Design a protein with these regions (language model features):
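GHKL-family ATPase ATP-binding module
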Residues: 1-268
Length: 268
């Protein structure tokens, strides 16, 4: 409908009404408070300083969401029920000008914001977003993040002689991600996704931009915070030792199953 002139006012802003069409959205036309709260909480963390209020007039529930810490606060929130092995999350924020794959003479601004903190669990918790939209299946931003992490930690562990001489194994990406809670947010103009659901980012320019930003940030953190770096590296090495021990145990079991009853040379 056309706009109406309501006269002078000191109020500013935009009011949007969404009323679901029952002929399209049936049988679900009722709004779930918890679903809205979780999504608005995400947006609050992903957009630092934005003030969001949720008011449910059906029940009288009201909550105000305002996060000044960005994804750093998001990671702390996610780790509330977990025991972190280092106090402060690693926080990286940078805009990288990346050459366009389609037009090499043009640069694309890629805003990268990431926070990570390790805890004493054995599972990885990674949430990745592009322009505030979650990607359940990852994509080029997650690939860039993992590449940077692998390079940074392997170099730091090797250069600081943290591994013992008896440790005859390589550190893998899975070792580094054990117990990791991480939130990765990128903002990029005209992103491309693998499907209409936007579950996977495929914009090629994002991967090198994220790798560059995270590599620089991680290297700086590790050099400036040796105590926390040692705690994280010990966690990573512990995961690698456990993986190697499990591999050796499987080999012993396999030899016992398939090698039993055979002559010594054949059993070997």
């Amino acid at each position: 409908s056309p706009m109406k002139d309501l006269g002078p006012t000191d109020k500013r802003g935009t009011e949007v009404h969404f009323l679901p069409n029952k002929s399209i959205f049936m049988p679900i036309t009722d709004f779930n408070y918890d679903t809205l709260l979780n999504r608005l909480r995400e947006l609050s963390f992903l957009n630092s300083g934005v003030d969001i209020e949720l008011n449910d007039e059906r029940t009288g529930k009201h909550v105000r969401l305002e996060s000044e810490g960005g994804v750093r606060s998001f990671v702390l929130y996610k780790n509330t029920t977990r025991h972190a092995i280092h106090k402060d999350p690693i926080y990286i924020q940078k805009t990288v000008m990346q050459k366009s794959a389609k037009d090499p003479g043009k640069e694309i601004p890629v805003y990268v914001e990431v926070a990570m903190q390790w805890n004493d669990s054995y599972n990885e918790s990674l949430a990745a977003y592009t322009n505030n939209i979650a990607q359940r299946d990852g994509g080029t931003h997650v690939t860039g993040l993992r590449l940077a992490m692998t390079q940074a930690f392997k170099n730091y562990i090797a250069n600081n002689d943290i591994l013992k001489k008896a440790d005859k194994f390589d550190i893998t990406g899975e070792d580094m991600r054990e117990g990791l809670t991480c939130v990765l947010s990128v903002k990029v103009p005209q992103p491309s996704f693998s499907s209409q659901t936007k579950d996977k980012l495929v914009t090629s320019e994002v991967q090198p931009a994220v790798t560059a930003a995270v590599s620089e940030g991680l290297n700086t953190f590790l050099e400036e915070n040796p105590d926390q770096a040692k705690e994280i590296c010990n966690k990573i090495i512990g995961a690698a030792r456990a993986r190697e021990a499990a591999r050796k145990a499987r080999e012993v079991t396999r030899k016992q199953v398939f090698g039993g009853g055979l002559p010594g040379k054949l059993a070997d």
